[in-house]
């Protein structure tokens, strides 16, 4: 009952109710409320959201994670997603299967070798903002598991025990630097 009266602060410092936050971007993402827990640290994502005209709310207190889980349980069709969890279709352009497969294979090999991380997940997408060369996304499920582990004092545990870190390196196929690396994998 009280969820109708709870106010969320959005990226423009406006306060919205739960229903208003859902309604705000209904055309762009049905039944999804995007949020940030640190607008400064996630400023690249915040700027991308603003550029695409997509709103997000700010949830930076410890009580927010259990609260949004409770809201998701009470409203089964509603999902809260942190802005760095994944790039939805509003931020990307279509890419052909052949081009995607070729670029992903080449760039995955190059970055795994350069970063010396065999377990690195690499994803290639055409992000609309050509200035962005790469981003790290963390799946919502993995991030929530990590938050829960921190809350219960288990932060020293390895997230790989629960199916990996959920981190993905997203490379922008529209970026000049990524195009250069693709054309010159040896440098």
Regions found by a protein language model. Give the residues of each.
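Conserved GHKL (Bergerat-fold) ATPase module
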Residues: 1-187
């Amino acid at each position: 009952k009280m969820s109708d009266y709870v106010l969320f602060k959005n990226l423009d410092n406006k306060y919205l109710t739960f229903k208003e936050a859902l309604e705000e971007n209904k055309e762009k993402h049905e039944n999804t409320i995007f949020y940030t827990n640190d607008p400064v640290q996630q400023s690249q994502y915040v700027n991308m959201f603003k550029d695409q005209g997509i709103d997000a709310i700010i949830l930076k207190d410890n009580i927010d994670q259990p609260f949004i889980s409770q809201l998701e349980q009470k409203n089964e069709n509603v999902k809260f997603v942190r802005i760095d969890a994944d790039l939805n279709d509003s931020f990307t352009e279509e890419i052909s299967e052949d081009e995607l497969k070729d670029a992903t294979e080449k760039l995955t090999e190059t970055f795994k070798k350069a970063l010396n991380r065999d377990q690195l997940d690499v994803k290639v997408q055409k992000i609309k903002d050509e200035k962005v060369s790469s981003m790290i996304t963390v799946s919502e499920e993995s991030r929530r598991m990590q938050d829960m582990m921190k809350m219960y004092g288990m932060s020293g545990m390895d997230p790989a025990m629960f199916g990996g870190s959920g981190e993905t390196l997203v490379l922008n196929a529209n970026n000049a630097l990524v195009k250069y690396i693709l054309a010159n994998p040896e440098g």
